[in-house]
């Protein structure tokens, strides 16, 4: 999961590409040129650099091993300008994706839960217990105060140019988050997006100053709740397949939610003999969860079809495996859609992608 990072990365990449270009500003936009620059940015490592990382755990790594990992797609690389270039996180990903390499790294460094995992070990049982006790799905409120800051590097944008900035802001039409309170923004003039917009944002703009970074920030509060639906198979009622809502969320949506013959066959295999939508979704979820380890992802726009990419490469980040799950659910007649937002933990937050089926 990395949606907000990808958004900021895309903006930064566009700024860098524009600033570094020596061609006429009047040249029309060309996706192929843009794609090429994005690939160069993502695939920026040489073989010797990747080997240096691998040697931290496998000191005697061989060329033969490198070729084997490349063939298995555990080590991600591609040819650009006639040169083999490796994904910027190819080394770390190898030790997440390849089971033997994973075991070697764990043997050397051990395992310890992250800060968010430690919080979840306490918070998730609290939510489940509260749902069972109170008999409702939304429980355990926590008041959050958030300061979000975005900094554009010094001279990344020519002095005098206006920088337009959209920062995330809590939606107010979601039952699990309430009492949103705006406190402050870095600029005297700002605009909130309409409640009808798909994304909730606060918009500001500022003129770039030579020799100085451009800083945008906002502060707000809201109450976040835990949410858990203790579903049973018998709770699921037949779908009304005639509604616009059902049709929208069981339809193909190019270019990533495509019902290819390969995915249709896979969905049929995973759900064979099952008629209950909840149990179908559970089968699909368990298969995706058990077979595709998390790995840092290249930019989504450079991938032709993300679910097929996940199948081919046998790994994905949270958004990529979500798209595989969504596509398999929709093929199976189960409504599903993509969502993104923030995991909020004490003194930290993480941009994250998830889904709803």
For each predicted feature, which ranges?
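Short, Lys/Arg-enriched N-terminal segments with co-localized hydrophobic residues
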Residues: 1-3
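Sec-dependent signal peptide recognition
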Residues: 5-10
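C-terminal motif of bacterial Sec signal peptides marking the signal peptidase cleavage site
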Residues: 18-19
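Intrinsically disordered, low-complexity N-terminal segments that are enriched in acidic
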Residues: 32-229
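Cysteine-centered nucleophilic/redox motifs
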Residues: 165, 284, 313-343
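Acidic low-complexity segments
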Residues: 194-312
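Beta-rich nucleic-acid/ligand-interaction surfaces
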Residues: 343-351
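Conserved small/polar residues in nucleotide/adenosyl-binding loops
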Residues: 353-357
């Amino acid at each position: 999961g990395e949606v907000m990072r990808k958004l900021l990365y895309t903006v930064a990449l566009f700024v860098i590409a524009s600033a570094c270009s020596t061609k006429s500003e009047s040249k029309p936009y060309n996706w192929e040129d843009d794609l090429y620059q994005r690939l160069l940015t993502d695939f920026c490592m040489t073989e010797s650099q990747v080997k240096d990382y691998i040697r931290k755990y496998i000191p005697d790594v061989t060329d033969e091993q490198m070729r084997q990992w490349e063939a298995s797609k555990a080590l991600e690389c591609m040819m650009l300008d006639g040169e083999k270039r490796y994904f910027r996180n190819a080394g770390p990903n190898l030790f997440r994706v390849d089971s033997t390499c994973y075991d070697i790294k764990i043997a050397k460094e051990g395992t310890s839960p992250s800060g968010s995992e430690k919080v979840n070990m306490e918070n998730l049982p609290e939510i489940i217990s509260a749902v069972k006790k109170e008999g409702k799905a939304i429980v355990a409120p926590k008041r959050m105060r958030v300061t979000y800051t975005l900094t554009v590097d010094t001279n990344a944008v020519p002095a005098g140019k206006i920088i337009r900035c959209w920062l995330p802001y809590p939606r107010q039409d979601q039952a699990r988050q309430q009492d949103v309170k705006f406190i402050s923004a870095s600029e005297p003039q700002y605009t909130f997006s309409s409640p009808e917009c798909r994304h909730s944002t606060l918009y500001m703009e500022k003129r770039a100053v030579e020799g100085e970074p451009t800083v945008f920030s906002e502060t707000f509060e809201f109450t976040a709740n835990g949410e858990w639906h203790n579903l049973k198979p018998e709770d699921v009622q037949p779908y009304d397949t005639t509604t616009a809502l059902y049709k929208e969320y069981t339809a193909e949506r190019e270019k990533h939610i495509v019902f290819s013959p390969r995915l249709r066959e896979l969905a049929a295999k995973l759900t064979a003999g099952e008629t209950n939508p909840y149990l179908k979704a559970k089968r699909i979820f368990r298969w995706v969860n058990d077979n595709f380890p998390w790995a840092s992802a290249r930019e989504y726009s450079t991938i032709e079809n993300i679910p097929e990419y996940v199948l081919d490469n046998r790994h994905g980040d949270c958004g990529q495996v979500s798209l595989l799950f969504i596509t398999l659910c929709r093929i199976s007649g189960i409504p599903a859609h993509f969502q993104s937002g923030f995991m909020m933990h004490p003194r930290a937050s993480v941009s994250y992608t998830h889904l709803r089926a």
